Amino acid sequence: MWVARDAKVYPTAYLGAPCIIGHKTEVRPGAFIRGNALVGDNCVVGNSTELKNVILFDNVQVPHYNYVGDSILGYKSHMGAGSITSNVKSDKLPVVIHNEGEEIETGRKKVGAMLGDYVEVGCNSVLNPGTVIGRDASVYPTSCVRGVVPERCKGNIAVKK
């Protein structure tokens, strides 16, 4: 485990190994980092947020009540309160990424979401297993997203910015 000297980790946060916490990152009270986590510089891992098998690029914010598992969050991406990355299908079969009629077999039972840089996920949204969201896209609050969301889209694949 490695935590940058200028990172702030509150006493009630849990850090499991292996884990790297970058410079000026804040791990707030009640955060639960289960391990296999690479958290970049200037990130916020907030109250009651759980991370597992993740890469958070610099300036990512998962500030309140988020679950991020088996996922990659790009530079300056933000997940609103209560939004989660679901990483296991309800039928427990391997995750397939759906992209405009193409099905990409992952061969893995646990795959969360992959967010490009500058992605905004609205409050209480669910990103289903294998969701890919392109750079500078926005997901509306309370959305349930599946498949590939192109870059610079708003909503649930619907409206271009």
Residue ranges and their predicted role:
Residues N47-S48, N53-K161:
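Glycine-rich hexapeptide-repeat left-handed beta-helix
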Residues M1-F32:
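Extended, small-residue-rich solenoid/repeat segments and analogous flexible loops
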Residues T25-P29, G40-G46, T106:
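Active-site-adjacent structural elements in folded domains
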Residues G16, V44, K109:
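Short, flexible, glycine/charge-rich loop motifs used to bind or transfer phosphoryl groups or to couple energy/partner
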Residues G22-H23, G40-D41, K52, G69:
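The repeat-register position in solenoid repeat domains
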